[in-house]
UniProtKB/Swiss-Prot annotation:
GO terms for cellular component: extracellular region. This is Uperin-1.1. Expressed by the skin dorsal glands. It comes from Uperoleia inundata (Floodplain toadlet). Keywords: Amidation, Amphibian defense peptide, Neuropeptide, Pyrrolidone carboxylic acid, Secreted. It is found in: Secreted. It holds the Pfam family Tachykinin. InterPro entries: Tachy_Neuro_lke_CS (IPR013055), Tachykinin_dom (IPR008215).
Amino acid sequence: QADPNAFYGLM
């Protein structure tokens, strides 16, 4: 499962 924080970092 990917980390939600990583997704936010991309944004």
